[in-house]
Amino acid sequence: MAILSTVPALLFALASWAPTVAAQSAADYFVHELPGAPKEPFIKMHAGHVEVTPEHNGNIFFWHFQNQHIANKQRTVIWLNGGPGCSSEDGALMEIGPYRVKDPDHLEYNNGSWNEFANLLFVDNPVGTGFSFVDTNSYLHELPEMADQFVQFLEKWFAMFPEYEHDDLYISGESYAGQHIPYIAKHILERNKKPGVKTPWQLKGLLMGNAWISPKEQYDAYLKYAYEKKLIEKGSPIALQLEQQWRICRTSLAVTNTVDFTECESVLQKLLEQTAKVNAKGERECINMYDIRLRDTFPSCGMNWPPDLVNLTPYLRKAEVVSALHIKPQKTTGWTECNGAVGSAFRAPNSVPSRDYLPDLLKEVPIVLFSGAEDLICNYMGTEAMIGDMEWNGGKGFELTPGNWAPRRDWTVEGQPAGFWQEARNLTYILFYNSSHMVPFDYARRSRDMLDRFMNVDISSVGGTPTDSRLDGEQGPATSVGDIGKNGTSADAETQKKLDEAKWKAYYRSGEIVLVIVIIAAGAWGWYVWRERRKRRGYSGIMGNTPPIAQRGTTRGLEGFRDRRTGRDVETGDFDESELDDLHVTTPTVEMDKDRYSVGGDSDDEPHDEKPSRSNGGRSGR
């Protein structure tokens, strides 16, 4: 009877497993229609959750946009926003994605989208960010565990979308993603070198914008940038206060080599506070830390920026959008730009700054660091100081030979000064003139020109009009900012054929797995029915007085669901009830918590006001 008693459990496990396995195919993630999006051009999308830590209900959300054209090879760009804890839907709908939010109900096409020649994969990272979710007692704390989990996500994602696994892979992002990206790249390279890895991922480059990489230089740059931009005057009472706070910060920096220093964060906070003024309306306003040309109400100081944010949040909370993006019901709170609880947990006290890994990464992977000149919080002076102090590939900084530095090449796009490029030994630095913390928000087409140059895009097989992009007056490679020729989408039929073959192989594999499950379940059920009939005919086993199987198995299953509720995230509060609704058993009813949370409602992690916040436990969201 021991074997017999396991049959219901086996059947239940198989029944539970079958939908899970069946969902692990690209078809289930296909976005059939995105509410409010323009009909043309057609953009193929997939979106949804990938479970990474079942024991903690950890699910990472992704949103994938297929490229519009294939130029000489297949490429995929992964995009991450910063925070930590800020959603990559910022990048998808306010920066490099194919759409921008026009109003709370409508999107419009972004003519500078990065998906012209590259597939785009936006990921809400780490768990708990954006549409991703996890139990609140399981937020991540360190950079290595984040990178491990991200590689797990990619393993599962490529298993579902094998047609992209051989693409040239690029990882890009901004702000605190300057910590995430080098760690992820390091873990990918280590993964590729492990014995038994069937498909090494073709990591071809990293792009980081206004990136928080080296705390030492970046914290030091707050005051230097404020002086350079005349936000404060040297020797003034405000300057003397800030200099005193900087000395406290510098003492802390000398003691430990970590990422986050409260004493140093205070330098920026005091700068914003001391420079705040009362405007003509009698309102106290301060410098926008993400774009010093702008002002914001105090103490937001940039948290309400960019202006698209006022439409982005209600759009992503619309029930039809949530449904279209396949958001799991376990994600019961509405989308928020930045999750303060995630940011507060992710202090990385035992992680070294990602700057420490750049020299080794540059031995294997080209890197682009780009900066908007008007950003304060992750300003270009800190990035330039870090580069100047760093040694890699046989040299220090951009020095080519003693006393001879790599030139800064003037960059113009469509006849307008765009910035400058500087490069040496696998590292490229680009300064964008008149640009904020979110460079692609200001200059989407210019940022895509940067990407296409970095990826060595060759549009000769595509057709269309190349952009007039020049370095020191030289035209350079032919990249495009739009106006693609009519033959663009069919330029590489052979490549598309290979993609389709890989996709259908994945579908067949999923179908085979489900078929095996059905066969096993049918066999187990048949055996179980045969045993029950023999019992009714008078057959008795050794354990004749054992309680009925259904009674024993069901009680244990309900207790299991109840146990999983303990310490659960409010975001996953409905999970147990929705699972139990599908259990058609005749047992005493268990009283469950009746609170319900709407996906379209306010997040428990955000303040209940009209404006979204990037606040991360006292830190400014990067």
UniProtKB/Swiss-Prot annotation:
<keyword id="KW-0645">Protease</keyword>
<feature type="topological domain" description="Cytoplasmic">
    <location>
        <begin position="531"/>
        <end position="622"/>
    </location>
</feature>
<feature type="glycosylation site" description="N-linked (GlcNAc...) asparagine">
    <location>
        <position position="111"/>
    </location>
</feature>
<feature type="topological domain" description="Lumenal">
    <location>
        <begin position="24"/>
        <end position="509"/>
    </location>
</feature>
<keyword id="KW-0333">Golgi apparatus</keyword>
<keyword id="KW-0325">Glycoprotein</keyword>
<feature type="glycosylation site" description="N-linked (GlcNAc...) asparagine">
    <location>
        <position position="487"/>
    </location>
</feature>
<keyword id="KW-0053">Apoptosis</keyword>
<keyword id="KW-0121">Carboxypeptidase</keyword>
<dbReference type="GO" id="GO:0004185">
    <property type="term" value="F:serine-type carboxypeptidase activity"/>
</dbReference>
<feature type="region of interest" description="Disordered">
    <location>
        <begin position="465"/>
        <end position="492"/>
    </location>
</feature>
<keyword id="KW-0732">Signal</keyword>
<dbReference type="InterPro" id="IPR029058">
    <property type="entry name" value="AB_hydrolase_fold"/>
</dbReference>
<feature type="compositionally biased region" description="Basic and acidic residues">
    <location>
        <begin position="559"/>
        <end position="571"/>
    </location>
</feature>
<dbReference type="InterPro" id="IPR001563">
    <property type="entry name" value="Peptidase_S10"/>
</dbReference>
<feature type="glycosylation site" description="N-linked (GlcNAc...) asparagine">
    <location>
        <position position="426"/>
    </location>
</feature>
<dbReference type="GO" id="GO:0006915">
    <property type="term" value="P:apoptotic process"/>
</dbReference>
<feature type="glycosylation site" description="N-linked (GlcNAc...) asparagine">
    <location>
        <position position="434"/>
    </location>
</feature>
<keyword id="KW-1133">Transmembrane helix</keyword>
<keyword id="KW-0812">Transmembrane</keyword>
<feature type="region of interest" description="Disordered">
    <location>
        <begin position="539"/>
        <end position="622"/>
    </location>
</feature>
<comment type="function">
    <text>Protease with a carboxypeptidase B-like function involved in the C-terminal processing of the lysine and arginine residues from protein precursors. Promotes cell fusion and is involved in the programmed cell death.</text>
</comment>
<keyword id="KW-0378">Hydrolase</keyword>
<feature type="active site">
    <location>
        <position position="375"/>
    </location>
</feature>
<dbReference type="GO" id="GO:0016020">
    <property type="term" value="C:membrane"/>
</dbReference>
<dbReference type="GO" id="GO:0006508">
    <property type="term" value="P:proteolysis"/>
</dbReference>
<dbReference type="InterPro" id="IPR018202">
    <property type="entry name" value="Ser_caboxypep_ser_AS"/>
</dbReference>
<comment type="similarity">
    <text>Belongs to the peptidase S10 family.</text>
</comment>
<feature type="signal peptide">
    <location>
        <begin position="1"/>
        <end position="23"/>
    </location>
</feature>
<feature type="active site">
    <location>
        <position position="437"/>
    </location>
</feature>
<protein>
    <recommendedName>
        <fullName>Pheromone-processing carboxypeptidase KEX1</fullName>
        <ecNumber>3.4.16.6</ecNumber>
    </recommendedName>
</protein>
<feature type="active site">
    <location>
        <position position="175"/>
    </location>
</feature>
<dbReference type="GO" id="GO:0005802">
    <property type="term" value="C:trans-Golgi network"/>
</dbReference>
<keyword id="KW-0472">Membrane</keyword>
<dbReference type="Pfam" id="PF00450">
    <property type="entry name" value="Peptidase_S10"/>
</dbReference>
<feature type="transmembrane region" description="Helical">
    <location>
        <begin position="510"/>
        <end position="530"/>
    </location>
</feature>
